[in-house]
Amino acid sequence: MSKIGLFYGSTTGKTESAAEMIQAEFGGSSVVTLHEIADASDSDFDGYDFLIIGCPTWDIGELQADWDGFFNDELDNIDFSGKTVAYFGTGDQLGYAENFQDAMGILEEKISSLGGKTVGSWPTDGYEHEASKAEKGGKFVGLALDEDNQSELTESRIKEWVAQLKSELRI
């Protein structure tokens, strides 16, 4: 089994594409195993000490449909104690400036309450949003991607974030 489990939900393919880029940047499937949350169960989280959670913000500050179902039906069954968790999200900072990356913040708050330790915070500099549930202490709780308005920055942001995670996790 790989060292890292990456669990994501994707409706339009943008979050899935980011998940694949993150996996490649870490070194491929021998290091990071991808799990679509639509096909995952709570037991899939058991074999990993390090998790990456990816979710787009959907509608007006909501979880993506697959994450919404998992959040309501299975997330409470997982013991995140002893697990280190990083987050990334996709969203539209201009069209939804008042709730940019809210889904990432919703998941981070819930998983932290279940014992998960958050790593991988990301600066808010360079973004044009008004508010976000994913902001804590002047930073995002994870990597914020905007394929609608800043797609040209996605690759470099992922490279920088993965390097940061490797340093934080000493891998």
Task: Label each PLM-derived region with a short phrase.
Residues K3-E25:
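N-terminal beta1-alpha1 ligand-phosphate binding loop
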Residues A19-S30, E109-S113:
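Short helix-loop-beta junction
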